[in-house]
Design a protein with these regions (language model features):
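Hydrophobic alpha-helical transmembrane segments
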Residues: 141, 171-219, 241, 279, ...
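Interhelical loop/hinge segments that connect adjacent transmembrane helices in multipass membrane
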Residues: 2-19, 212-256, 299, 304-314, ...
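Membrane-proximal transmembrane or re-entrant/amphipathic helices at the cytosolic face
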Residues: 1-13, 436-437, 441-443, 465-520
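Helix-loop junctions and terminal segments of transmembrane helices
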Residues: 71-87, 161-162, 220-225, 278, ...
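Membrane-interface junctions at transmembrane-helix termini in multi-pass inner-membrane proteins
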Residues: 148-175, 190-195, 216, 363-395, ...
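Interfacial segments at transmembrane-helix termini and the short loops linking adjacent helices
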Residues: 119-143, 334-370, 439, 475
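Transmembrane helical elements of multi-pass membrane transporters/channels
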Residues: 21-38, 197-212, 216, 232-302, ...
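Signature of the first transmembrane helix
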Residues: 3, 15-83, 103, 109-116, ...
Length: 520
């Protein structure tokens, strides 16, 4: 039986090398997003103004709700393409892709018509000043067109990731992120507003969609995507898997986009921007961890297809522990220098509203997202995510209800407390409990393997960082903050190398470094 990727360059045989290579390529793409996001967010805030930036953020939050109509098809595409690719069933790969694309085309046309009719009513839900009414409506339609195209063409990206060609998707991300940053910067410098930025964003997304399809044809040349290969039985199979990821998607929308939507309903639109800035900062940085989770997902699917249970347990422990260790120096820096960072990043006026949210959000993100994201992706890759999806749905329902009561009384500070507490209870405790049950691991042991070593390495670094801030590096300029970050990173990673890395992985790292050093 011919493999669906017969013409693709061979991938290294050792699983550790494959995993590390995939993660590194993912990080390359995310690094570009992080750098451009770090530089562009304050520039957007200053050039568009608080309300303009708030409307920009609000529009993107609304668009995320369109994924309700996906019904889990994209996640099912990644799951089943990874499975059939691992077992060498190229015909089934064609059936999955053809069915997913056909369904997505129908949904895209339907969604475009609905939004065109409902745009005036959507606009009336928010506190938008008269001067921005037309701009908001135009931006909403532009982003809707982009989403409809993405619903279709992102399936090709999912298939590329499913066969573990993260080098390809990362190259696409690097190219399109770079072009978007260049175009946005130029247009803002020339004084253009949010509608012109929306047009530029749509054009850049079209470039990404074209590259997705082009590389899909190169990576999976034997895959045939056509209506005649689509089938309702295949769609039902995808729905049966995807309905739980759909529930998970709906829940994540409520958790990620619910706060800005409700803030925009109860408070002036500018508060959406103040909330969005620290959230986006953390999301940009946590995306490093998210890319490890994506690699964990497809590796888990492949291991499950080959019925290799023992490596799964190690994958669960190592992926989460190393995610936490990688992120910890940045968490320490943002915790200790958060206020100074925001004063330099967006100015004192914006920092007064946005900076107090950061430490509250850090608690939730560190313990529930960074340290446990691979847990959720592992459950997804194994197809054992049903109870996790229900837990996310419960978290989302409680969060929306609580936010409806809290935001009018305590504003955006109350909103971030609600989000962080619920995040820790569900994703920080319930998700790892599900993984421990699924893989027959002791819950206490599983949690200990994740948290004890990274936190132990962090204690002396935190003490030194507080001392440094109180004496020689108070954070009055970017050089001081970056120097403090570099110092924390060097100290922490030196300790983490000895404390967090297992002996086998230390040896693997040393071997890799020697090989790089010996290369001409």
């Amino acid at each position: 039986m011919n493999r669906a990727t017969a013409s693709v360059e061979p991938i290294p045989r050792r699983r550790s090398e494959i995993f590390v290579r995939s993660v590194v390529w993912n990080w390359a793409g995310v690094s570009i997003s992080l750098i451009t996001g770090f530089l562009l967010s304050p520039y957007l805030f200053r050039k568009l103004g608080p309300e303009g930036y708030g409307i920009w953020a609000l529009s993107f939050s609304l668009i995320e709700y369109y994924w309700l109509l996906d019904l889990g098809v994209r996640s099912a595409t990644a799951k089943f393409v990874a499975h059939h690719w691992a077992t060498g069933e190229s015909t089934q790969v064609s059936e999955i892709m053809s069915t997913a694309v056909s369904y997505s085309c129908l949904i895209a046309v339907f969604m475009l018509g609905i939004v065109a009719l409902a745009a005036p009513r959507i606009e009336g839900f928010f506190h938008i000043s008269d001067s921005y009414h037309e701009s908001f409506r135009a931006l909403l339609m532009l982003m809707t067109v982009s989403w409809c195209l993405g619903l279709i063409f992102n399936l090709f990206s999912a298939a590329i990731e499913a066969v573990q060609r993260f080098d390809v998707t990362s190259r696409i991300a690097i190219i399109t992120t770079g072009t978007r940053a260049a175009v946005w910067t130029t247009m803002l410098y020339l004084g253009y507003g949010i509608v012109a930025l929306g047009i530029a964003t749509l054009a850049n997304q079209c470039l990404m969609y074209a590259l997705n399809y082009y590389y899909f044809r190169k990576v999976l040349p034997d895959c045939r995507v056509s209506l005649r290969h689509a089938g309702f039985e295949t769609l039902k199979k995808m729905w049966n898997y995807g309905i739980h990821t759909f529930l998970q998607t709906v829940s994540m929308m409520g958790l990620n986009q619910g706060p800005p939507i409700l803030i925009g309903h109860f408070l002036p639109t500018e508060f959406v921007g103040f909330y969005n800035l620290p959230v986006r900062l953390l999301q940009y940085t946590v995306e490093f961890i998210g890319r490890i989770g994506v690699v964990t997902n497809v590796n888990a699917a492949a291991l499950a297809a080959r019925e290799e249970s023992q490596p799964l347990a190690k994958l669960a422990e190592y992926a989460n522990r190393y995610c936490l260790a990688i992120f910890m120096p940045l968490a320490i820096l943002l915790w200790i220098y958060g206020d100074q960072f925001f004063r330099l990043w967006i100015g004192p006026a914006g920092a007064a509203k946005a900076a107090p949210l950061l430490p509250i959000l850090l608690i939730g993100y560190v313990f529930a997202v960074v340290a446990q994201f691979s847990s959720s992706m592992l459950l997804l890759g194994l197809g054992k995510h049903q109870r996790y999806a229900k837990g996310l749905f419960a978290e989302a329902v409680i969060a929306v209800a609580a936010l409806w009561l809290v935001i009018p009384r305590w504003g955006i500070i109350g909103a971030v407390w609600v989000c962080s507490i619920l995040m820790v209870l569900n994703r920080g405790l319930f998700a790892p409990w599900l993984v421990s049950k699924t893989l027959s691991l002791g819950f206490g042991h599983y949690m200990g393997t994740i948290y004890i070593r990274p936190l132990a390495a962090a204690v002396p670094v935190i003490a030194i960082a507080y001392l440094v801030r109180a004496t020689v590096l108070p954070g009055g300029n970017w050089l001081q903050i970056f120097t403090a970050g570099a110092l924390s990173g060097v100290l922490y990673y030196a300790l983490a190398y000895l404390i967090c890395l297992d002996r086998e992985h230390r040896s693997l790292l040393r071997t890799w470094l020697r090989q790089r050093k010996s290369e001409p």
